[in-house]
UniProtKB/Swiss-Prot annotation:
The lineage of its organism: Eukaryota, Fungi, Dikarya, Ascomycota, Saccharomycotina. Belongs to the ATPase protein 8 family. The chain crosses the membrane at residues 17-37. InterPro entries: ATP_synth_su8_fun (IPR009230). One of its GO terms (biological process) is proton motive force-driven ATP synthesis. The keyword Metal-binding does not apply. This is Putative ATP synthase protein 8-like protein.
């Protein structure tokens, strides 16, 4: 590995890590929001 490539390597590692974290957060928030929405809707449905 030449010294010129090392910073790019670290940047790629950082970028991929960031993307993975972002995707995980998106999936978790999507699941969490759908769960909350389902609870809310079922509560409204049952209270009628």
């Amino acid at each position: 590995m030449t010294p010129q490539i090392i910073p790019f390597f670290f940047m790629h590692q950082f970028t991929y890590g960031f993307l993975v974290i972002l995707l995980t957060l998106l999936l978790l928030s999507y699941a969490f929001l759908s769960m909350i929405l389902r609870l809310y809707l079922s509560r409204i449905y049952l209270s009628k």
